[in-house]
Amino acid sequence: MQSFSQHGQDAFVYETFFKSKDGQGYFVDVGAYDGVTFSNSLFFERHLGWSGICIEPLPAAFEKLRGSRTAVCLNCAVADRDGKGEFVDVDMPNFGKMYSGLRAEYDQRHVQILNAYMTGARLIEVPLRRLADILDENGVRKIDYLSVDKEGGELKILKSIDLKSYDVRVISVENNYKDAAISDHLLGFGYRLIKTFAGFDELYAK
């Protein structure tokens, strides 16, 4: 079975947690990009028949996403409020627009990287949605695999859902600068850090 994740996260999650799982699973992919490139969720949809939700704010990436996936695809950014927000649309060699993110939550520690490598950037307006509202609208209470890749604001996303009310088994979260607040939050809900991929993509489970 083909792996699609940047560093083999999907294959590791499958082998470690779901290889013997009976029945269909469910994923939520926040920051799904085009649905294929470095995707943490496509493996489960394509090879195992899982259903789920893919969320991507960039209009061009979203058009590719909804053409490549069978999951529910939503064109918005996940935030701690509903409304509209400014989104930094960045072009980077070899990474395309994958360093893009909400302006209000953009990780300023990326700036040095952007100044060195980016070939262009612009501000666009995107819809904002709360993750809890998205889950409730789709009748989702149990998530086998939650993947969060947002270039800043990951902690806000994790705090925006009550992890006591939603049954989330495995969580991948990008933590580029090893912010302790992310691990402290998840450890407080009984999660354990299972593995860190490439020094920045953390995998938690309970």
Where are the language model's segments positioned?
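Phosphate/nucleotide-binding beta-alpha loop and adjacent structural elements of enzyme active sites
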Residues: M1-K206
